[in-house]
Amino acid sequence: MDIFEVTEKKKQYLPLLLLGDEQEEMIDRYLERGRLFVMQSESPIAVCVVTDEGDGVLEIKNLAVHSDFWRQGIGRAVIDEMANHARGVYHTLQIGIGDSPATMSFL
């Protein structure tokens, strides 16, 4: 499974993004200024949006895993990849995700 950054047509991942944040308005807001990463096999498995919050802080705004892949370590793998991405550039990786029922069960 590969993780790659998506720079165009980010809204095509909206169904997965809505698993991590039920408010499409909020998704639009941070998707515009953030970076979208997708884990994909044959189809998208997980998405993650990160934003530069300044002062050396990278924040995970949205993290969602397709329900067919829950409890398989996918979310952890995405977080690990974001930590690797942040290393050497940011001093803090913080998680600022919504409180949808699916998100809360992950935490």
Name each region found by the language model.
Residues 63-70, 98:
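A short, internal acetyl-CoA/4′-phosphopantetheine-binding micro-motif in the GNAT/acyltransferase core
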Residues 69, 73-81:
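Conserved acetyl-CoA pyrophosphate-binding loop and the N-cap/start of the following alpha-helix
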Residues 27-31:
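Short loop/turn motifs at secondary-structure junctions and domain boundaries
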Residues 1-26:
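Short amphipathic alpha-helix that is part of the acyltransferase structural core
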Residues 106-107:
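Conserved active-site tyrosine of GNAT-family acetyltransferases
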